């Protein structure tokens, strides 16, 4: 049974010792974790401490214990199972887990393996037909209970946009011939079968840009009787920012997207790692930001998210500096796990012993801020905010840069007693101009006034009436250099809404 997401009633909780017995998996990223029916979750491979991994860790759902099974089998080179690897694909059909590709060292892999989880036996499968080239960072999904569809990846020289279908009974690979427009080649994307369509989101593309587009592929099932073809989907709502290395997990009428790696900035580019939950509502066909309570996990990419009944289990990942080994639950508000106290701080147990430093912003840093409304709002919005940023907000009357900008734009200095009129004129200006007319020197004061209005609304309203209806994308930014060109229209739109209410 597929878990049912409850969009306004989900709760984050870091797993503790009462949740599991046995030895939990070592920290890693680029691994896979798949659910085998309702009984177990199987973790395979990954990368940590400059090593590629080939171990298997299994979570027994009923007994709530982690264990390492004794696997046997043989491959073409006499090995008992797949070589160490990361950034491979893993797909489940019945009790079998299928593994393809990945990377080990500087080598891209093209071997194909099956693990029978009833008897814990590996088999290297020799396919025939249109064999896919070795690759990493591909994405794949099961088609019913017999076939696998795989799209894209990176072969070490180029990004890929090919589509392959593997029949797990005959072991025949078929490259799908697609007519019409096709998505740009990519790797690090997600691919999910929804009824008769393969949905592909995001990834890193040719020349390195990170993408945020959504595509649907028809004609992948025999029942379709349709010519295979791609369609780009542009859905309403709170769409995810461009990213790669994210996870997409099915939850009834929803798809749950978590985490990933993107870039930020306008004047200069820098890496960004995400930790928000965004859902694709298949009923209303739109994106929605999932409201969650409690402090979320640190931002990360190349993690795993699996569903266990009505719960989702997050494991591992990487944030540009740290490799995580923590386990987190995302559960409905009525779940017993949701009734626990606040999540404990992220500590060194989340990472390999030779990795130091915290995530982007730790809970311990936030606790030092006491009862600051700014920090409280940031925690409720599920974002990180530096203590410096939380202390930098002043009333608009005391914002000298705001007053000086108004004088510069309108050509005269207002009398000391008319500063309110000066500020109002500037706000009217920002709510009336098109995004392409705004000047570079306006962005800093605009962003600061936008954040000031959000904080003021939070202080004047209860959390429920304020938070559940509003999403503010730029509240967490430290300065305007983190804005991108395509952020400006959205910033002006949100700013106008704040002023109108």
UniProtKB/Swiss-Prot annotation:
Keywords from the named record: Golgi apparatus, Kelch repeat, Protein transport, Repeat, Transport, Vacuole
A GO CC term attached to the entry: plant-type vacuole
Deletion phenotype: Accumulation of proglutelins in seed endosperm. Mistargeting of dense vesicles (DVs) to the type II protein bodies (PBII) protein storage vacuoles and reduction of PBII size in endosperm. Formation of paramural bodies (PMBs) secretory vesicle-like structures charged with DVs in endosperm.
SUPFAM superfamilies on file: Kelch motif (SSF117281)
Gene3D superfamilies per record: Kelch-type beta propeller
Annotated region (Disordered), positions in chain: 341-371
Kelch repeats, residue ranges: 40-86, 96-145, 147-196, 198-247, 254-310, 312-357
One Pfam family cited in the UniProt record for this chain: Kelch_KLHDC2_KLHL20_DRC7
GO BP annotation list: intracellular protein transport
Record's compositionally biased regions (Polar residues): 351-370
Tissue: Highly expressed in leaves.
Chief site of localization: other
Subcellular location(s) of the protein: Prevacuolar compartment; Golgi apparatus, trans-Golgi network; Protein storage vacuole
Record function comment: Acts synergistically with RAB5A and VPS9A to regulate dense vesicle-mediated post-Golgi trafficking of major storage proteins in the seed endosperm during grain filling and maturation.
Self-association state and partner proteins as the record states: Interacts (via C-terminus) with VPS9A.
PANTHER family: ACYL-COA-BINDING DOMAIN-CONTAINING PROTEIN 5 (PTHR46093), RAB9 EFFECTOR PROTEIN WITH KELCH MOTIFS (PTHR46093:SF13)
Protein name in the entry: Protein GLUTELIN PRECURSOR ACCUMULATION 3
Source organism: Oryza sativa subsp. japonica (Rice)
